[in-house]
A protein has these predicted regions:
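Flexible, charged surface loops at secondary-structure boundaries
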Residues: 1, 24-25, 50-55
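Glycine-rich adenosine-cofactor-binding loop
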Residues: 1-19, 121
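Hydrophobic anchor at the start of a short beta-strand
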Residues: 3, 26-29, 82-83
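Short hydrophobic segments within beta-strands
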Residues: 5-6, 32, 61
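Short, solvent-exposed amphipathic alpha-helical segments in soluble enzyme
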Residues: 19-24, 75-77
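NAD(P)-binding Rossmann-fold cofactor-contacting core
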Residues: 22-40
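Phosphate-bearing ligand-interacting subdomains
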Residues: 36-109
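A short alpha-helical cap/connector motif
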Residues: 107-120
């Protein structure tokens, strides 16, 4: 399955660095970003017309939970079937898949994932 990183910013670059450094088997098609065009990290920035939403995993490479919620709703509107969130942790180093090693699956988060706040006193 091919994948796209949604977010050509700081965490998108970190995701790309993890992906290239560890030589994962997943195929990176490109980045998506609502504000950028051209290339990012030498990878093309693609549009919805460039991907098959039924066969392409979209990895949200943003850390702000409010922005993640907005992106998630956009992905649902486009009927993306394979949604992941890059969490910047390699918690299963035995896998050769970027999606299972570096991300959490979000395809079943529901209609409206809400960000949560934690307060530590």
């Amino acid at each position: 399955m091919g994948m796209v990183f949604y977010g050509a910013g700081y965490f998108g670059k970190i995701a790309w660095e993890h992906y290239t450094k560890k030589k994962y088997a997943d195929r990176l098609i490109g980045f998506m970003d609502g504000k950028k065009t051209g290339q990012y990290c030498g990878v093309p920035i693609v549009s919805w017309n460039d991907i098959d939403v039924t066969k392409t995993a979209v990895v949200i490479t943003v850390q702000n939970p409010y922005v993640v919620s907005q992106i998630y709703r956009e992905l649902q509107n486009y009927k993306v079937q394979h949604i992941f969130w890059f969490i910047n942790l390699n918690w299963t180093e035995t896998s050769n898949s970027f999606l299972s090693s570096e991300c959490i699956e979000g395809s079943n988060w529901g209609a409206c994932p809400m960000p949560q706040a934690e307060i530590h006193v």
